[in-house]
Amino acid sequence: MDEKQPLTPEQQKLVDEQVEALMRGVVEVVPKEAFREKIEKSVRTGKPLNIKLGMDPSAPDVHIGHTVVLQKLRQFQEYGHHIQLLIGDFTGKIGDPTGKSETRKVLTDEQVKQNAQTYVEQYGKILDIEKTEILYNSRWLSELKFDDVLKLAGQMTVARMLEREDFSKRYKTGQPISVHEFFYPLMQGYDSVAMETDIEVGGTDQTFNLLMGRQLQEAYGKEKQVMLTLPLIEGLDGVRKMSKSLNNYIGIDEAPNEIFGKAMSIPDELMVKYYKLATDVPMDEIEALEKGLADGSVHPRDAKMRLGHKFVEMYHGKEAADEAEQYFKTVFQKRALPEDIPVFSWEGDKEVPLIDLLVTLNMQSSKGEARRMIQGGGVKINEQKITDIHTVVSVEDNMIVQVGKRKFAKLSLT
């Protein structure tokens, strides 16, 4: 079909619908006019756009913060566009220096491979993986010869690299910057050249890297991609970006009760943002909810319960969501112990340090984590709070151990 042919009224309506839906939650589109032009071209020709999301496979656990861009990809996919999920197995050996204050450790090939597989499995909870192209950038980056690398490096100046806030801070404070770190945005940009990307999606912290794709596509004679950025969502502390290392996250692979319980601790002022960015709840419903919260006709607790139910339903199904909601009401609103506390057969010493007990029961992943939880008042034995890290527990039959608000264990000596 002629790409210059005017759109029919039906096609124009579809373009308007796509642009409006795909702009939901977006912070910036560069350039905005090209975004609409690409959608128009796709509708006119019937050819789907190539939509790219690059992943640095250094931390494989997907949390709600990651799903902001994944929900956007899902929208593109529902409109028939082609999703290119790029696993940076080659760039992952460097690690994305964005926001880092020091040089990152290099991952082994095996670590990158394992992390990438975990990513794909978890992303499949949001995307239709059968309709998603999975690419590894080692396919083309490992084929570059040294003269190709020199050509690539010649597209960027050191001064331009130092405009990046993270590099600038490290340079000014005397922190080392390895030359290979400068290649990360160059390689990410070259990925867009190799993949012939039409639109690249990423968080606002990826703006520099995404713009690099446009610059390199032009340098290599390709049509320039559109950059589309989405917000970084604050974690459960309400201040810092959601991150597993900061322990302010909701992991999509966590148990349903854990997801629901964590959702109930989302700060009131962030609820609407979570709804808009991390769910597919229609905007008119979100606007009505926002209005209700503002005029007091909707209680924040009820809005959080709906959000928690939605998160669990998205990643574990409706039945699990219903059960998690009931569990929360029983344990936290009625202050009762759950009926289905896991039972552990205890065959160890009858006198055991509390820290060792928590780790042995897999209620904490390390002694350091257990120590911090005890000091923070998050551990109870038979509903009695324990804050002394040196406590030695006398193990009894049917003794209840509680960590935080949602982890329980019952010990059996028989």
From Swiss-Prot:
Record's keyword terms, sorted: Aminoacyl-tRNA synthetase, ATP-binding, Cytoplasm, Ligase, Nucleotide-binding, Protein biosynthesis, RNA-binding
GO cellular component: cytosol
GO biological process terms held by the UniProt record: tyrosyl-tRNA aminoacylation
Family to which this protein belongs: Belongs to the class-I aminoacyl-tRNA synthetase family. TyrS type 2 subfamily.
Stated name of the protein: Tyrosine--tRNA ligase
GO molecular function (one): tyrosine-tRNA ligase activity
Chief subcellular location: cytoplasm
Residues engaged in binding ATP: 244
Top-rank taxon, per record: Bacteria
E.C. number: 6.1.1.1
InterPro entries xrefs: aa-tRNA-synth_I_CS, aa-tRNA-synth_Ic, Rossmann-like_a/b/a_fold, S4_RNA-bd, S4_RNA-bd_sf, SYY-like_C, Tyr-tRNA-ligase, Tyr-tRNA-ligase_bac-type
Function field: Catalyzes the attachment of tyrosine to tRNA(Tyr) in a two-step reaction: tyrosine is first activated by ATP to form Tyr-AMP and then transferred to the acceptor end of tRNA(Tyr).
Broad EC category: ligase
Statement: the UniProt record of this protein carries the keyword Plastid: no
Subcellular location, record wording: Cytoplasm
Motif 'HIGH' region: positions: 57-66
Record-annotated S4 RNA-binding domain positions: 352-413
Pfam family, one: tRNA-synt_1b
UniProt lineage: Bacteria, Bacillati, Bacillota, Bacilli, Bacillales
Reaction catalysed by this enzyme: tRNA(Tyr) + L-tyrosine + ATP = L-tyrosyl-tRNA(Tyr) + AMP + diphosphate + H(+)
UniProt subunit comment: Homodimer.
Disulfide bonds: none
Residue positions of motif 'KMSKS' region: 241-245
